[in-house]
Amino acid sequence: MKFWLILFLFMSRAVWAEPIKVWKEDVAFAPFKTEHVELLSIVELTSFDKRFGGLSSLMIKDDEIISTGDHGHLFRFSRQDMGQCDVVALRDLKGKRLKKKKQRDSESLTLDETGRLLISFERNHRILPYSGEGKIVGDPIPLPSAVEGLPNNGGLEAIETLSDGRLVIVGEGRKRDEEISLWIEGHDKKSWEKKTITRIDEFRPTGLTRLPGRDRLVLLERYYAPITGVRLRLSYLDGITGKRGDILAKLGPPTPLDNFEGIAAYQEDNGQVRLMLISDDNFSILQRTLVMTLGLR
């Protein structure tokens, strides 16, 4: 039975996935260190494949880096070599590719306790369970009714699972909002508890990740203004109470930054915990797909 299951998964990936070439180039940066983190590397990813871009989420599972794009694709890299990735088209319940912007605008992803990929979408706010081959493998996740009131382009920007499998979801909201809304799934998998985080200095949430082995989360927030450019903030977030903790870092010029939206935590073999961030280039020639790695101190 196990042999046939492995064979099926291999064959399905071969059918649905297509490898593309990706170029990786180191980006120079000045040393950056705080009490909590140290900047270790920044690389830029490019590809001639027109599907590559708009990477707005990030997850690391074993030795695989997984991301989703704004145009409805799943990208799967090897953590050892990001020079090639498999591209998978996300599909709807009928097995058709997601083509309309309202349907394909994915923002975040996480893994549930059964191994399914949970992918959040905005505009048509929803969270759908997917296989690694881009196929829906279950019913949509029941969400709090208040999610429907989130703006089209300010929906489920960040999601993550706690150690017991419950979801934490964060709404980006409107620019003028004074608070950030988040919801923690109940143990019954039906109810939700709403929490709020005070918005500080007009930063908006873009990503969320859980540190290995505990329910301590790291919240990624971004601020942009034409004159000052992009700034990032990383904060601890209690996954049980929803309260903001210490600020790990504030990054701005001269550090090379872009539209960072995805974040994932992972642990090296030596026990060191790393944070990896990825930026969404919006398929614009004025932006870049950057991957930044920081070490927790």
Give residue ranges: language-model regions.
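Sec-dependent N-terminal signal peptides
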Residues: W4-S12
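Sequence/structural signature of beta-propeller domains
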Residues: A14-R297
